[in-house]
Amino acid sequence: MIKEEEFFSTDEKVISNTINSYTSLIKQKYGNIIKRVILYGSWARSEGDSSSDVDLLVITSKVPVKTKLDIIGTACSYFTKTDVYLSIKVFSEDEFEQEKDYSFVRTILQEGRQIV
């Protein structure tokens, strides 16, 4: 979880609360399926502002595509409540491992902050 004291501005507190709320919800809803959640992108680099989306990578055990879409869909409700756009990518552990040599995943591993 992101500690609220890590952030200082109102925007950052809203972001922190939204990330914590979303990750708690998917952990509660999907349990042991959720293996890791990693914050990456501008907020992970402390460069986010009120116009920035929040990039989260959710790593799961092997699940059907429908479950991945449900995990992504769960994030949509947060935009209407908070104006925070959660941009969710979902990879299984195997997919994440296979993608480690690609720049997208390498960047996440370098700059990302593990939330769960």
Where are these regions (language model features)?
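Catalytic core of pol beta-like nucleotidyltransferases
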Residues: 1-35, 44-50, 60-116
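Short beta-strand->loop micro-motif that forms the acidic, two-metal-ion catalytic signature
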Residues: 55-58
